Amino acid sequence: MRRRKYEEFEEDNGTVLRYARHDNGGGFVESHAHVDPAAYVAENAYVDRGAVVGAGARIASAAWIDRGAVVHAGASIGTTAHVAAGAVVGRDARIGARAKIGAHAHVWDGVRVDSDDVISEGSVVRAGSQRSRAA
């Protein structure tokens, strides 16, 4: 079966979002997002409108980078993880599988967020700081 080159979704307000496949990995990138060509976006991952993904970043299968989120160079986002709207993931940070980074949260450079962890909306996670655990 031939793989589709793009997908379109219509939002409740009538806005049509068009997602094209990224050359490195085949994941879906919305036309108003910016993903560096050297970043890897796995086939079932989505990068939403206004999001930015830096060089060498890795977005795993079924991960979702929400509107306006930033994933800096060298960061890694685990399988089915969600980086919410406006959140920032620093350089070389590692977000584990199924982790959830809340809206407008900031995960600093080099920080490791464990699988299944939940970072609250607006939180700032620095290296060595306490992280919220999922219930």
Segment roles from a protein language model:
Residues 1-70:
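Extended, small-residue-rich solenoid/repeat segments and analogous flexible loops
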Residues 2-22, 70, 78-135:
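C-terminal segments of enzyme domains that contribute to small-molecule binding surfaces
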